[in-house]
Amino acid sequence: MTQTWLTVDCDDFRHIPKHYGHPTRSKSPILSQELSPEFKLGMRGFEHWLSTHENPVTLFVIADSLENQEFCLWLKGIITEYSNRITIGCHGLTHKSWSAWPEDVEQFSQSITQAMEQISGFAGENFRPWFRAPAGYMAPWMVAPLVDCGITVDSSINDSILTRVKAGGGNTWQQVRDTCQQVGLLEREWLTKWRLPVNGPALSLFPLS
């Protein structure tokens, strides 16, 4: 029987590559740490959705989001209300598109270590050492440092014709996949069909929309 893993990335507008973390795409930074109206609407919608079913859900949290008190109160409330169904994974210290930048194992390792400490300290028993690369930018060189930092499951591979560049310059998703297998990192890939995404932000783009 096929099982579906329900996951949500907790990105606000200030986190996305258009505004942050990408060497060429980030043109207009959003300096405010306040939650956007759209994100707040999503928080309320997510909470309502949780009340309509009994399925477990994983939230991938960016550590810098924990600097916002409103988000922290909301997330703590979700964990308290649905503690047996909610798990919290790591979506990075910030939302930096790591594979779009030159390889920097030391800085990447430091950022993941800090993120794990901050997120696990907040989420407690609901934290899991699971990782999803910010904006899906995941290169082969990032795999071994993740394992060294204690990550046991990765969910970054989105093997779509629209996301090939996110594996890093000259790399392929198969190389990321092979590296995960070599070091024993369990990979849970994004669902695709006909090499196109069936979920995620790409569904807002024509013709998938």
Functional labels for PLM-detected ranges:
Residues M1-T80, R128:
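Active-site beta->alpha N-cap acidic-glycine motif
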Residues P23-R25, K76-G77, V105-F108, N171-Q174:
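Short, hinge-like loop/turn segments at secondary-structure boundaries
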Residues N55-A139, I157, T192-W194:
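Metal-dependent polysaccharide deacetylase catalytic core of the NodB/CE4 family, i.e.
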